[in-house]
């Protein structure tokens, strides 16, 4: 077993035991899913959580299993410039990171007017429909094609252009946030 120190977010600071069986089970499940996503591409992780964090501790084993190249962000403030350098295929973080990302994107989207606003609304609506495995009609397919080029591709490029998945762990991700990020072209797993 491994004992990880926690800061006591929900109480007093304490050591928490993670069993080797639990760690391996998490790693095997993650490896299977991530290998299917990255296929033959090299696994490139950009990480910023402290290495002592229980989620990051497990992620390190997954990185080894995948033979991944790992970049460590200099700081949260330098995350976007570090993304541009690393061009990650996988980014792992806790739900709070994705909540903050959602808020920033949502605020930016809400400032848009006219055609841009309509395009963003279509991107979210059609992306959600795709996520729910609902068929798009011919008109929706054409609109979705333009949403992919004009909105989703630009968003993906903000994260290095090679991102296959955000992986949220260490707590529950709000379903609404996961659906939103997926709908705008940022594949998000939990």
Question: What kind of feature is each model-predicted range?
Answer:
Residues 1-27:
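Conserved AMP-binding A3 loop
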Residues 3, 16-19, 48, 73, ...:
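Generic beta-strand/beta-sheet core signal
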Residues 6-9, 45, 50, 91, ...:
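Conserved S/T- and glycine-rich ATP-binding loop of Class I adenylate-forming
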Residues 24-44, 51-152, 162, 187:
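Conserved AMP-binding/adenylation subdomain of ANL enzymes
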Residues 12, 32, 64, 157, ...:
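Short polybasic/polar patches that bind polyanions
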Residues 91, 147-190:
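Conserved AMP-binding/adenylate-forming
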Residues 4, 60, 80, 178-179:
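Short glycine-/small-residue-rich flexible loop motifs, especially phosphate/cofactor-binding loops
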